[in-house]
Amino acid sequence: MTKSNGEEPRMGSRMERFQQGVRKRTLLAKKKVQNITKEDVKSYLFRNAFVLLTVSAVIVGTILGFALRPYKMSYREVKYFSFPGELLMRMLQMLVLPLIISSLVTGMAALDSKASGKMGMRAVVYYMTTTIIAVVIGIIIVIIIHPGKGTKENMYREGKIVQVTAADAFLDLIRNMFPPNLVEACFKQFKTSYEKRSFKVPIQANETLLGAVINNVSEAMETLTRIREEMVPVPGSVNGVNALGLVVFSMCFGFVIGNMKEQGQALREFFDSLNEAIMRLVAVIMWYAPLGILFLIAGKILEMEDMGVIGGQLAMYTVTVIVGLLIHAVIVLPLLYFLVTRKNPWVFIGGLLQALITALGTSSSSATLPITFKCLEENNGVDKRITRFVLPVGATINMDGTALYEALAAIFIAQVNNFDLNFGQIITISITATAASIGAAGIPQAGLVTMVIVLTSVGLPTDDITLIIAVDWFLDRLRTTTNVLGDSLGAGIVEHLSRHELKNRDVEMGNSVIEENEMKKPYQLIAQDNEPEKPVADSETKM
């Protein structure tokens, strides 16, 4: 009884302190609202003009798209209508290649081998952790909601699936990491293709009755041959930037330049200037982004199939994917950021708003990369050495939304086929989806190819991917937004964990500058002795 009586005053004092804190915050908020002037409103609108315009573009684009759907525009008319959006995609994709190369080279060159190794390890651990969590969330959600009830016979199918073996896809990934021609890697990727070839297979004469007869007729013929057709892998290529190969080369090249000290200074300055020039171009393109996003979204809504073809199972599948992505993006990633940095994740995410909306509009994390750089460095103040190192790698291999979607979609296809997966098969799906999402950038046509690999790993029919293609255009945008959010929060986490290495590097750079100045000092003193009447200002003016 005594113990409980002692606890009551403590609880009362805590409640009083909490209430006082709430009152103080309320009064402060009221004062702030009362002190707001027209100038404050103008400055707020000016500072957040990009974000407000981009949000408005999404809203207007959605309304415009649905408003024009009753007019049943032809494919040609929709393409003409979407042209401003196509221009935005082309502008952003134009900057991706030089941005990835220059940012990675400068990022790696600015760090010593020890610091870059630690940062790389932290980034990889973060990527693996969030990807595995995303896969687990996808599996749990699809098992709980069970959207695949019923039969697949009445479900709408769309598109065709190209078959590919897991071994060839994995080998293509490794091949693309080491492109034989860097120029070709800027616009082509290696992809194994398949062609039908005929082989002559010998048949021993004594193995068949026919062989025995012929042997009796003509002893000169020892064997017969039959023609066998077989699909064999042959080297091929597809159009598209080999991002994985360029990332690997740029990281190695930057690492070597960083270790060259004074000899590599000219190259470091060149790539640093290139990176700065690209970011200035990004600043110009950002003003056009809202208009492009408006027409991209409106055009995609006009292209959309009739909503009537989407049955109950596909609608439930869509809801399941959205719930899984929301849990990962709204709960897991911000919580992980808070646990590591002890900072408010929503303030950080607020600075990323334009990058997230651009990802939603473009459906490409690579095309969004220039905007992501701008948001992280200018709005959130993330160190450039971190963004240049973490973001290009993250955009290439860290795809949480893709991993969640692939694991969830595989189990959904199993459900519509009434295929009961055991625990071992679910683990297989988890591992395959994780590996497939990490290597997606090195595999051409990543979405479909990686999905085929996941289904093949547990013996599910790959043709059933056509069941989910009808809604994939929409879910792909949500996956991309989740991927960009994961990359950006990862940059914030890696910066927090690497703050000591960055400070030490700053001190080393400061010491080297002092040493250089001290080495130059004797020459300045001699010049002063020879010409004592000339002030320092005159010499600076002449220069």
Curated annotation (Swiss-Prot):
Predominant localisation class: membrane
Biased composition (Basic and acidic residues): 531-543
Transmembrane segments: 48-68, 87-108, 123-145, 237-260, 270-297, 319-340, 386-412, 473-494
Catalyzed reaction equations: K(+)(in) + L-glutamate(out) + 3 Na(+)(out) + H(+)(out) = K(+)(out) + L-glutamate(in) + 3 Na(+)(in) + H(+)(in); K(+)(in) + L-aspartate(out) + 3 Na(+)(out) + H(+)(out) = K(+)(out) + L-aspartate(in) + 3 Na(+)(in) + H(+)(in); D-aspartate(out) + K(+)(in) + 3 Na(+)(out) + H(+)(out) = D-aspartate(in) + K(+)(out) + 3 Na(+)(in) + H(+)(in)
Family matches, as InterPro entries: DAACS, Na-dicarboxylate_symporter, Na-dicarboxylate_symporter_CS, Na:dicarbo_symporter_sf
A molecular-function term among this protein's GO annotations: acidic amino acid transmembrane transporter activity
Membrane side Extracellular: residue ranges: 69-86, 146-236, 298-318, 413-425, 460-472
Residues reported in the UniProt entry to bind Na(+) 1: G394, N398, N483, D487
Record note on modification: Glycosylated.
Keywords noted in UniProt: Amino-acid transport, Cell membrane, Chloride, Glycoprotein, Membrane, Metal-binding, Phosphoprotein, Potassium, Sodium, Symport, Transmembrane, Transmembrane helix, Transport
Entry binding sites for Na(+) 2: T396
Intramembrane segments per UniProt: 346-376, 426-459
Binding site for L-aspartate: S363, S364, S365, T402, I443, P444, Q445, A446, G447, D476, N483
Tissue localization of expression: Detected in brain and cerebellum. Both isoform GLAST-1 and GLAST-1A are expressed in bone and brain. In brain isoform GLAST-1 is highly enriched in the Purkinje cell layer in cerebellum.
A GO-annotated cellular component: cell surface
Pfam families xref list: SDF
Topological domains, Cytoplasmic: 1-47, 109-122, 261-269, 341-345, 377-385, 495-543
Region named Disordered: 522-543
Family: Belongs to the dicarboxylate/amino acid:cation symporter (DAACS) (TC 2.A.23) family. SLC1A3 subfamily.
Function: Sodium-dependent, high-affinity amino acid transporter that mediates the uptake of L-glutamate and also L-aspartate and D-aspartate. Functions as a symporter that transports one amino acid molecule together with two or three Na(+) ions and one proton, in parallel with the counter-transport of one K(+) ion. Plays a redundant role in the rapid removal of released glutamate from the synaptic cleft, which is essential for terminating the postsynaptic action of glutamate.
Description of how the protein assembles with itself and partners: Homotrimer.
Domain remark text: Contains eight transmembrane regions plus two helical hairpins that dip into the membrane. These helical hairpin structures play an important role in the transport process. The first enters the membrane from the cytoplasmic side, the second one from the extracellular side. During the transport cycle, the regions involved in amino acid transport, and especially the helical hairpins, move vertically by about 15-18 Angstroms, alternating between exposure to the aqueous phase and reinsertion in the lipid bilayer. In contrast, the regions involved in trimerization do not move.
Protein name as annotated: Excitatory amino acid transporter 1
Species this chain originates from: Rattus norvegicus
Gene: Slc1a3
